[in-house]
């Protein structure tokens, strides 16, 4: 079993639907991320989105209890070189403040938890080690204070 890795993205509240309690987010742009000792690449075209519907949306990747579940990914798709997701947020009282912060634009960043099935290693023109995911899948998304994929944003027009 491969190790669950984490990568971040951000979202804007413009697609928040209060009636449905949903928000649309770009959860990955495939941007390079500097890791310890290498550059990580998650090409969007190599992502397997089968089975992502129903994946949990967590509080900062915390998996220590069901109270950490803030919502669920209803669907995800590739478009314009991005992975986008429709997230259904919980209506539980204990997460109402978090949902309000999402709607108000206070909480904007998302991070994905993913597994890489196959890596390819190479060296950049600058001599840096590069690890490219040839096959990878998303297993959860989390709201986080700071994200690594700075180019990922929520779409203003769904």
Where are these regions (language model features)?
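Short conserved beta-strand and strand-loop elements enriched in small hydrophobics
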Residues: 53-64, 110
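A surface-exposed loop-and-adjacent beta-strand signature within N-terminal beta-sandwich domains
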Residues: 61-76
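Acidic Ser/Thr/Pro-rich low-complexity disordered segments
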Residues: 37-39, 64-66, 123-129
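Polar/acidic, low-complexity leader/linker segments enriched in S/T/G and N/D
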Residues: 1-53
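Generic secondary-structure boundary/loop-capping signal
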Residues: 30, 36-39, 46, 55, ...
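Short, charged/polar surface micro-motifs in flexible loops or helix N-caps
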Residues: 31-32, 63-65, 91-93, 118
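Residue microenvironments linked to proteolytic maturation
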Residues: 8-17, 22-25, 56, 74-158
């Amino acid at each position: 079993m491969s190790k669950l890795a984490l990568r971040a993205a951000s979202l804007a509240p413009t697609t928040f639907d209060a009636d449905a309690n949903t928000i649309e987010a770009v959860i990955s742009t495939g941007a390079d991320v500097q890791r310890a000792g290498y550059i990580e690449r998650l090409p969007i075209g190599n992502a397997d989105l089968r089975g992502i519907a129903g994946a949990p949306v967590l509080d900062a990747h915390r998996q220590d209890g069901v109270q950490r579940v803030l919502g669920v990914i209803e669907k995800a798709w590739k478009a314009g070189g991005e992975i986008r997701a429709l997230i259904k947020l919980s209506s539980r009282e204990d997460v109402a403040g978090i949902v309000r912060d999402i709607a108000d634009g206070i909480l904007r960043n998302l991070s994905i938890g993913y597994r890489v099935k196959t890596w390819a290693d190479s060296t950049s023109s600058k001599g840096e080690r590069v690890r490219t995911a040839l096959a990878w899948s998303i297993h959860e998304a989390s709201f986080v204070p700071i994200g690594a994929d700075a180019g990922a944003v929520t779409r203003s027009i769904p």
